[in-house]
Regions:
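Outer-membrane beta-barrel translocator domains and adjoining extracellular loop/strand segments
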Residues: 37-45, 84-93, 127-136, 175-183
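Short hydrophobic "helix-edge" motifs at membrane interfaces and signal-peptide entry regions
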Residues: 2, 147-148
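A structural signal for short, well-ordered beta-strand segments
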Residues: 29, 119, 164-166
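Cleavable N-terminal export/targeting peptides
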Residues: 1-22
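Gram-negative (and chloroplast) outer-membrane scaffold detector with strong preference
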Residues: 61-133, 141-146, 154-160, 193-210
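Predominantly the C-terminal beta-signal and adjacent terminal strand-loop region
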Residues: 38, 48, 148-151, 156-210
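Short glycine/proline- and aromatic-enriched beta-strand/turn motifs that initiate or cap beta-hairpins
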Residues: 15-72, 201-210
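Short helix-capping and inter-helix turn/linker motifs at the boundaries of alpha-helical repeat units
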Residues: 50, 140-141
Length: 210
């Protein structure tokens, strides 16, 4: 019992100083939902598109706090990947999205936890590695994109924290590229000429402070 109390007290003391660190490295993973237009997919039925929108996301980020104590201004970088896939009788889609961007953040630091708002503008690499009647078919588009994230973290020790992050990512495109049967062509977006696409992810992970 004395040992357990000692461990809890030690952990609490460590947690009190976790917010004093000026840099952090984070890794997260969790569910993700595709937002906006699904472009170039192999099946346009409502049920297929609804299932295709559900996927997974993961991210790695670095952040350096450059000013402030209770409210800290920070700069850093984010990589986020995501995957969405579904199959039907005559084909399949596997959408992969990779996003990289510099980040700026505002963090409210408390004794045992912190809340953070972050965002940035970067580049999103999109590829749908689909199949039609067993033949490979690729859809791709690489576009400027932006993200906005809200996260919360509870300090576990003086260096480690458990965190959750809600991240919204958005981009738009006028055309996308299709490659099928060794032929490649560009497809213009119908109607408005532009297409919004992106994702909303809720990820969970660990932060290392140093």
């Amino acid at each position: 019992l004395c040992f357990l109390v000692g461990v809890l007290l030690t952990t609490s003391l460590y947690a009190q100083s976790a917010g004093d660190k000026r840099s952090s490295f984070s890794v997260h993973a969790g569910p993700s939902w595709y937002l906006g237009q699904l472009m170039g997919i192999t099946d346009r039925s409502d049920a297929y598109r609804s299932d295709l929108r559900k996927g997974v996301a993961w991210d790695v980020s670095y952040l350096a706090q450059v000013a402030g104590r209770k409210f800290q201004f920070g700069v850093g970088a984010l990589y986020q990947g995501s995957s969405y896939k579904n199959t039907h009788d005559t084909g399949a889609d596997k959408i992969l999205m990779h996003y990289m961007a510099p980040q700026i953040s505002l963090t409210m630091v408390k004794k045992h936890y912190q809340l953070q708002l972050a965002g940035g503008i970067g580049y999103q690499f999109y590829k749908d590695k689909s199949k039609v009647y067993g033949k490979p078919r690729d859809v791709s588009m690489d576009k400027l994109a932006g993200n906005l994230a809200l996260s919360g973290e509870y300090f576990l020790t003086s260096h480690w924290g458990a965190s959750a992050r809600l991240n919204w990512l958005a981009s738009s495109t006028e055309t996308y590229s299709v490659k099928y049967h060794d032929e490649k062509w560009n497809v213009e977006n119908p109607k408005t000429g532009t297409g919004y696409f992106g994702q909303l992810s809720l990820v969970f992970g660990l932060n290392y402070h140093f």
